[in-house]
């Protein structure tokens, strides 16, 4: 029904759209937040530039990749080096606080509303900011979880203790061999619980969150709903963006709002139901408070 080529960008001054979104948020019976990588980037979780140089300059010098994301695909020659990189990566993106209070400001906007969050982010920022865990659906995994690489089971395993130990004890871009994580059931290597292929483990908690999200959609079908999209691009639009467009098109009472600098757009078919704010997410949320 929709495609990127059919969208219209909203590039004018966003003051009117900010006020319109304030009013819509106030009057909405239900708010469904869809969050992508742009929201965490607005909170300061950037994967290149100064932050990358601060934590990974040694890896950059040795392996010549220019950002954290690219490093995640590098074929490190040993598991000790692989986990030295990934433990650092996980530690700074999962077990440190976001530099800016973007998620906290978002919570202030919806704390008194009937809300639910669906996100492709894996950095735990929503829970760290105080969002209700029962109102969150992390579709793509969590940096804070390991899974069997086979996988031999549908379990995930908390990794905070071992990640902290790896980062503390690594030297010369290597962790001690005894810290290499293995599956407690089959002894095969562990990996991150991140959706990359058909080996991604959707554990019991994942399925419970998915059901809560679907239940929220079903039970609010007769209410005035705001679909609030924040920082979602086109890497995986079928998870948040396209469903939000489709659900808005099916319900004349629904409103679709998109805050995303450079990608504030909506299909022409739902233009009259859309509020697109072409602005920095952090600044826009501050203006909405």
Task: Show which residues each predicted segment covers.
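Conserved catalytic alpha/beta core of Sir2/sirtuin-type deacylases, generalized to analogous enzyme cores
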Residues: 1-289
């Amino acid at each position: 029904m929709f495609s990127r080529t059919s969208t219209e960008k909203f590039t004018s001054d966003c003051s009117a759209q900010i006020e319109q979104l304030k009013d819509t948020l106030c009057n909405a019976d239900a708010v469904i937040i869809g969050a992508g990588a742009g929201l965490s980037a607005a909170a300061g979780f950037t994967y290149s530039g100064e932050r990358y140089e601060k934590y990974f300059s040694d890896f950059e010098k040795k392996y010549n990749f220019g950002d954290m994301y690219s490093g995640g695909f590098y074929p490190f020659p040993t598991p000790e080096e692989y986990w030295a990189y990934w433990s650092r990566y996980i530690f700074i993106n999962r077990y440190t606080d976001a530099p800016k209070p973007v998620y906290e400001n978002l919570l202030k906007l919806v704390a008194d509303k009937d809300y639910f969050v669906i996100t492709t982010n894996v950095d735990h920022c929503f829970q760290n900011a105080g969002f209700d865990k029962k109102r969150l659906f992390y579709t793509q995994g969590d940096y804070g979880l390991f899974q069997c690489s086979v996988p031999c089971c549908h379990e995930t395993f908390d990794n905070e203790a071992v990640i902290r130990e790896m980062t503390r004890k690594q030297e010369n871009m290597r962790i001690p061999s005894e810290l290499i994580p293995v599956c407690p059931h089959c002894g095969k290597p562990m990996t991150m619980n991140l959706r990359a292929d058909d080996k991604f483990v959707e554990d019991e908690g994942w399925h419970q969150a998915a059901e809560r999200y679907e239940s929220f959609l079903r039970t609010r079908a007769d209410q005035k709903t705001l679909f609030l999209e924040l920082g979602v691009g086109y890497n995986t639009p079928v998870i948040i963006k396209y469903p939000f467009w489709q659900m808005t098109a099916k319900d004349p009472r629904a409103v679709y709002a998109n805050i995303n600098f450079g990608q504030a757009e909506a299909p022409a078919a739902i233009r009259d139901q859309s509020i697109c704010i072409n602005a920095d997410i952090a600044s826009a949320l501050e203006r909405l408070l």
